[in-house]
Amino acid sequence: MPIEIPAPRMTFEVPLEDGARIVMRRHGNPDGVRLLVTHGNGFAADAYYLYWRHLLSKFDVVVFDFRNHGRNVPVVPSNHRYEQLIRDLERVVQEVKVKLGPRQTAGIFHSMSARAAMKHAVEIGWRWDALMLFDPPDVPLKGHPLYTAMEVFENKLTEWAKGRRRHFNSIDELTEEYKQSRATGRWVEGVHELMARSVLCRSADGSGYELVCAPENEAAIYAQALTLDLWPKASEFGGPVKLVGCDPNFKGAPATGPANQALGIEGGYDYSFVEGTGHLLQIEKPDECIRLTLEFLGKHGLA
């Protein structure tokens, strides 16, 4: 049976500075601590449901996709770069506060969105009661022993994304691609189809489906990761941050595992990794990721 996302209690749109709009979905307990939950590059927040469903009974869960992803209508020009993403995030945070009222709020981010949340927090300002970062693509500064490994990793992803298939005749076609890929084959049963459904939209000409996040937009984010010079210490944030990486010791694991372990140690973070996981740890081992989430939120009086 396909995994079905429950209907949200409320939806609203956040208008961005260039005319793009972010579709916000409010789930869970409206009286609870608020959690803003989103996704990684080329993916979509709905596909993380097997992770965030565990938060619905206690928390006010606001789920959203970054521009040109998921339930949002892509825009032209795409303005698909980190400098824009952090301004978008600021707009989202402020609009949520206006629309839903002030509340203790934590952010839960993965990969690209985690990197954007880091950049937002250190460059624009701290807007959270706590921040949880799942396997951000943290690139050390040049000269660091792990810089080259991350450079190779991001360059490979950039080239892969540039050549990525854009059009599919059916959702099943992309589902099978995810199932056959070494990088995505470890996802929990049912998530391959859910992810495919979440990242595809009907083609304008009605001939099938196409990726919401165009391959050139996905590639641009991978390439820009090498230019951010963002390797902050935990003390540079205005509040508690939890850094959770994929398994740095896992055979075939991405370079983000060792990089986040290094940042965790060198930067003085509250750091953990999830054993036996690759980059999509929240949908490979959602139960363990939820355990770490609740432990961290509880430690800071939010759960």
Regions found by a protein language model. Give the residues of each.
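Active-site loop/oxyanion-hole signature of alpha/beta-hydrolase fold enzymes
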Residues: 17, 66-108, 291
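Conserved HGGG/HGGXW glycine-rich cap/lid loop of the alpha/beta-hydrolase fold
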Residues: 25-74
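Conserved hydrolase catalytic core segment
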Residues: 102-146
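A catalytic-pocket lid/entrance helix-loop region that shapes and gates access to the active site
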Residues: 134-168
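Alpha/beta-hydrolase
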Residues: 165-251
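Catalytic histidine-centered segment of alpha/beta-hydrolase-like enzymes
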Residues: 274-286
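Post-His helix in hydrolase/transferase enzymes
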Residues: 283-295
